[in-house]
Design a protein with these regions (language model features):
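Low-complexity, intrinsically disordered/propeptide-like segments
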Residues: 33-36, 82, 94, 194
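Short alpha-helical interface patches
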Residues: 23, 68-78, 82, 109, ...
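Conserved beta-strand -> loop -> alpha-helix junction used to position metal-binding or nucleic-acid-contacting
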Residues: 42-49, 54-96
């Protein structure tokens, strides 16, 4: 399910049953939100390619805030709890600092540290392994590279919340909402697919009603 929620009052403006975040569907949903007359100041999302592409197509001037928890969680997963290399250990420390950035000075210091890390380990990031039998090359430290470049690509949209305190820096609100919904569904595991869908619709209706 894809859900569009007002973070201020936890009101679900629109939802769609889908098995994935799909560009055409999200593009249509965003157009429908605008057609409803909603004034959208910013969007906080997990950074899925289809979602970002749809936002830039339908709302090219909108402020996009990347969910910091999502970035941090994925990078920590790739770097592991005990990285083998110093580059991984140092990058992991920087990743752990992300959620502590509360001022523009914090941001500038952190970015400076990240740039220093890149300059220090740029040759390490380029190291490749080679298989003579196939002539195939691949990056030797792909998970460290993935972590770093995930951050680097997200960087322009990571700290919008520092300029506007009304912008949520995470999607924790909607994640909590989904968690609560899942707990209710778990109590009714015997429901058919159709009845589960109807249950979700009524759940959203009554939750929205309580927010008005």
């Amino acid at each position: 399910m894809v859900c569009y929620q007002d973070d201020t009052i936890s009101y679900t403006q629109l939802f769609r049953f889908s098995d994935a975040e799909r560009y055409q569907e999200i593009k249509e949903d965003l157009s429908n939100l605008l057609n409803l007359g909603l004034q959208i100041a910013s969007i906080t999302c997990d950074g899925h390619k289809a979602t970002l592409k749809a936002i830039k197509k339908i709302m090219p001037g909108i402020t996009i805030q990347r969910c910091l928890v999502h970035i941090q969680r994925m990078c920590l997963l790739w770097l592991t709890a005990n990285p083998t290399y110093d580059a991984g250990k140092e990058l992991r420390m920087l990743v752990l600092m992300i959620h502590r950035i509360e001022t523009h000075n914090d941001k500038q210091y952190w970015i400076h540290q990240l740039n220093d890390w890149e300059n220090k380990h740029k040759d390490f990031l380029k190291e490749k392994s080679y298989k003579a039998e196939t002539g195939r090359y691949w990056y030797k430290h792909k998970l460290i590279r993935r972590s770093f470049f995930t951050i680097k690509r997200a960087l322009p949209n990571m700290f919008c919340y520092l300029t506007d305190s009304n912008i949520p820096k995470t999607t924790n609100g909607i994640e909590s909402y989904f968690g609560h919904l899942k707990n209710h569904l778990d109590l009714h595991r015997g429901l058919t697919k159709n009845n589960r869908i109807n249950f979700i619709k009524w759940y959203i209706y009554f939750r929205n009603k309580s927010r008005l």
